[in-house]
Amino acid sequence: MKIYIITIFPDYFECFKNYGVVNKAIKSGLVEINTINLRDFTSDKHKTVDDVVYGGGPGMLLKPEPIFKAFDYIKNISKNPYTIITEPWGKTFNQEMARKLAEKEELVIICGRYEGVDERVKTLVDEEISIGDYILSGGEPATLVIMDSVIRLLPGVLSDDESKEVDSFSDGLLGYPNYTRPAEFRGMKVPEVLLSGNHKLIEKWRRFQKLKRTYKNRPDLLEKAKLSVEDKQLLKYIIEGKEFEDLIKEGKIA
């Protein structure tokens, strides 16, 4: 995948490219990240990228000319990139959107700044994306979130395919709790079921915890999640306030 980022702060992304999964993906040739400095496409000596808002109003807007020129440059060196822009009023980014973007061969991400961009820029855009209902100084942080989520879904990026399949949201539910050594720390013990060696029971415990965590923190996700008959029964127990250990003692889970 090739990603082109139109921004006035190209250096913002250097650290992101140099560490972790993203760096491994770049070194493996699985992704190429190109930062396009918007100021390189201005026509005045001050490299002006913004201007006042017609009709009055606070703040400044990114001008259309540099963005269109930068986009034309990208189109000349690419095939048919899918173009998104980070906007607070865009569609809220989620795992399903990340999956769809991961299927694209080329992405262009336009980072907004100040009060946004001239509305005519939207004629270049396939999709407007927001990462949440809050205000950021610009589109760069949102772009990092989107890229990180998308890149890790590219084939071959993660060394263990299972690690991405069981992550939060992969099945519409939040992830289950995880523990490592020691088995007891400051009086807090790892759940006995995880030490039992009973893999079937461990899978049931994990499913129970996923449902419980989702019910507690993101109940809205349950409306869209594909729940089995067993899931619905577990959810009923969770709503009743029962713990997994209670269900084992009562003989409802074995």
Curated annotation (Swiss-Prot):
Pfam families assigned to the protein according to its UniProt record, in alphabetical order: tRNA_m1G_MT
Family matches, as InterPro entries: Alpha/beta_knot_MTases, tRNA_m1G_MeTrfase_C_sf, tRNA_m1G_MeTrfase_TrmD, tRNA_m1G_MTases_N, tRNA_MeTrfase_TRMD/TRM10
Residues the entry annotates as binding S-adenosyl-L-methionine: 112, 131-136
Cysteines joined through disulfide linkages: none
Keyword Methyltransferase appears in the UniProt entry: yes
UniProt KW keywords: Cytoplasm, Methyltransferase, S-adenosyl-L-methionine, Transferase, tRNA processing
Gene Ontology molecular function, alphabetical: tRNA (guanine(37)-N1)-methyltransferase activity
Annotated NCBIfam families: PRK00026.1 (NF000648), trmD (TIGR00088)
Task of the protein: Specifically methylates guanosine-37 in various tRNAs.
Protein name: tRNA (guanine-N(1)-)-methyltransferase
Organism: Sulfurihydrogenibium sp. (strain YO3AOP1)
Gene: trmD
